[in-house]
Amino acid sequence: MKLDAITTQPVVETARFVLRPLRRSDAGLIEFYTKDERVACQTTTIPHPLPPGATETFINRCLSVEREEDVWAIDASAAGWSEVVGLVSLERLSRNQSELGYWVAPAFWNQGVASEVSAAIIEANPMENDTIFATVFQDNPASARVLTNCGFEYVGDAEAFSVARNAKVATWTYIRKFT
């Protein structure tokens, strides 16, 4: 694990990807992917349609010293793919806990991207958490498999509001404890 000099956010490498802090130059690809309803509807926070300026605002928030989460670009250029194929994040919670989130562009689905990058972030544990939570929509069992394959345990059902769907959506909540 290497530290990025600007943000002090670690760079995490996997066999195929480099998980690195976002750059302003990532805006075009992030916007292209998040405009896709299939991506937005599997998240709680991405609106659909994506309003003008939303991506730049998101990147500015991610680069802020006062940010509440660390967000990594999934850089696949070393594998001969796109420079950004998705994002993975850890949002800081109280009591040395965080919440894992990720999305992958549809062109790269079913290729193990989410599993590989989630496992790498969990192994690196860059925030030195005791516990990491994750929540997935119940209509996305592939994301649930990613979590169970990374050692997460199911803890219960809940609901979360999806901005893109403009509705509450049934979720499964998972936990991974380190201590």
Segments and roles (model prediction):
Residues 1-38, 74-179:
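Acyl-donor (CoA/ACP) binding surface of acyl/acetyltransferases
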Residues 38-60:
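Conserved GNAT-fold acetyl-CoA-binding loop/helix
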Residues 41, 50-52, 66-67, 127, ...:
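A short hydrophobic/aromatic micro-motif that marks alpha-helical segments and, especially, helix-coil
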Residues 49-53, 61-63, 105-106, 138-140:
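Juxtamembrane/interface motifs at transmembrane-helix termini
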Residues 60-73:
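A short helix-loop-beta-strand connector motif used in the catalytic cores of GNAT acetyltransferases and
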